Swiss-Prot record:
Gene name in the database record: vapB3
Protein name per Swiss-Prot or TrEMBL: Putative antitoxin VapB3
Lineage: Archaea, Methanobacteriati, Methanobacteriota, Thermococci, Thermococcales
Function, as annotated: Possibly the antitoxin component of a type II toxin-antitoxin (TA) system. Its cognate toxin is VapC3 (Potential).
Disulfide cysteine pairs (residue numbers): none
Keywords recorded for this protein, A-Z: Toxin-antitoxin system
Annotated source species: Pyrococcus furiosus (strain ATCC 43587 / DSM 3638 / JCM 8422 / Vc1)
Family: Belongs to the UPF0165 family.
Annotated InterPro entries: AF2212-like, AF2212-like_dom_sf
Length: 46
């Protein structure tokens, strides 16, 4: 499993780093926006 940040721009997700995948690999993408990420991080006890 890989977690990669991306920017949504002009209807396209642009990855901020390359994925280590073979050509034609099928993947499932779960989208978590910045607001939700902040909620998750704020709710954690460190």
């Amino acid at each position: 499993m890989q977690i990669v940040e991306a920017i949504y721009e002009d209807g396209v997700l642009k990855l901020l780093k390359n994925l280590k995948l073979k050509e034609h690999s099928k993947v499932i993408i779960k989208v978590i926006d910045e607001e939700e990420i902040e909620k998750i991080l704020d709710s954690r006890d460190y």
